[in-house]
Regions:
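N-terminal strand-loop element at the rim of the active site
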Residues: 6-13, 19-22, 26-63, 174-177, ...
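A conserved mid-protein helix/loop that constitutes part of the nucleotide-sugar donor-binding site
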Residues: 17-22, 213, 222-237, 254-260
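Nucleotide-activated donor-binding/catalytic signature segment of Leloir-type glycosyltransferases, i.e.
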Residues: 53-55, 257-276
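Short His-centered aromatic/hydrophobic patch
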Residues: 86-94, 113-116
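A short, active-site helix/loop in glycosyltransferases that binds the activated sugar's phosphate group
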Residues: 147-189
């Protein structure tokens, strides 16, 4: 079978890019011909590295250009592609490009939605602006704008669903959200395929003695989705109480300087900014994994961390958190119904930090 993965940025650092590389390599190892097509190349080489048998192709912007259409059409035809896996199903014009390029060909189109259907960066950005707006007129305007963007998102999702052979979500719990935002009642093309474990851990053997008194965050340092400031607000309540514990942040991003300034202002001494690193060694030694995102799909870091014995402490803003964690059994979830409360998150963490048996 001949497969083609299509995504916005590749090579690049991120969950979608990592999953793409892992799947491309696995399909190639199983004897399939695999191609990866991207519109933007952020880094020189992918991480993890692509198998030498996987071919990387470069398109460009604007997405709907005639040059992109001709190049994609030629690739689909000349390599006799059977399945296109669209990893960038929003905005809808990526799907429109695929359908134009596929016209008259027998290949199938799969759309993969890597987030909760009713949340994205644009919608969350407007919600954040509304929360900060002091002027009632501005708030009313932003509320209307948010409603319009939500309607546009729903229309875009309806288009992608209608023009794809299958529409893949990361959790069964997202099906209802998809139907709500699109207004669709007949959603028989929906499938659920969770993210794979993307960090190699075949040699790992859990040993409580190897675990250190460390809390861990892994991800982009940005304010829209990951909300790393919440992690630091939680840690600011914990650091004075637990002088032998450390917080490590593995990742980088546009909020790094602001987060470092917060640490300096609050005089937090045991916060380590590690930058982009292979997270596996950090998972191995961390006792707790902390994630306080405002929205997620099925976060790779939770799956990866749990596979290395790091106990997850999650903010339950995304329904798939409950697919991964059984509260009080293999981790803890702070319900999102009352909004994020750093004190409650810190109290949950403290309960685990004070009881070594709870961490094992």
């Amino acid at each position: 079978m001949n497969l083609l993965f299509l995504l916005g940025k590749f090579p690049s650092i991120g969950g979608v890019e990592t999953v793409t590389a892992i799947l491309a390599n696995e399909f190639s190892a199983r004897g399939h011909e695999v191609h990866v097509v991207s519109f933007e190349q952020v880094t020189e080489t992918p991480s993890p590295a692509l198998d030498s048998r996987v071919t990387l192709h470069r398109l460009g912007y604007p997405v709907s250009s005639q040059a992109n259409l001709a190049a994609l059409r030629d690739l689909l035809s000349s390599r006799r592609i059977d399945i296109v896996i669209n990893q960038w199903c929003l905005p809808f014009h990526v799907t429109r490009l695929c359908r134009k390029a596929m016209r008259g060909l027998s290949c199938r189109l799969l759309a993969v939605h890597h987030n909760a259907p009713d949340c994205n960066a644009r919608l969350e950005g407007l919600r954040m602006r509304m929360a900060r707006a002091g002027n009632p007129v501005n708030r009313a305007f932003l509320r209307l704008l948010l409603k319009g963007c939500a309607m546009a998102t729903g229309a875009s999702l309806r288009y992608v669903y209608a023009h794809s052979d299958r529409y893949i979500l990361l959790s069964d719990s997202f099906h209802r959200a998809f139907r709500n935002i699109t207004g669709l009642k007949n959603t028989g093309k929906l499938l659920t395929i969770p993210n794979p474990v993307t960090v190699e851990n075949r040699e790992f053997r859990y040993d409580p003695a190897f675990k250190k008194k460390e809390l861990l965050f892994v991800g982009r340092l940005e304010p829209n989705q990951k909300r790393v400031s919440r992690v630091l607000e939680t840690w600011a309540l914990l650091e004075p109480r637990f002088p032998d514990w450390t917080l490590r942040l593995v990742g980088d991003g546009p909020e790094k300087e602001a987060l470092q300034a917060f640490c300096a202002e609050r005089r937090l001494e045991r916060v380590s900014f590690e930058g982009f690193r292979n997270p596996a060694p950090y998972y191995e030694q961390a006792s707790l994994l902390l994630l306080a995102s405002e929205y997620e799909g099925l976060p790779l870091v939770v799956v990866e961390g749990m596979s290395f014995g790091a106990v997850p402490l999650l903010y339950g803003s995304f329904s798939s958190a409950y697919d991964l964690v059984d509260h009080g059994q293999n981790g803890c979830i702070l319900p999102a119904s009352g909004g994020f409360q750093a004190r409650q998150m810190a109290d949950m963490a403290a309960g685990l930090m004070q009881s070594p048996a709870a961490l094992h």
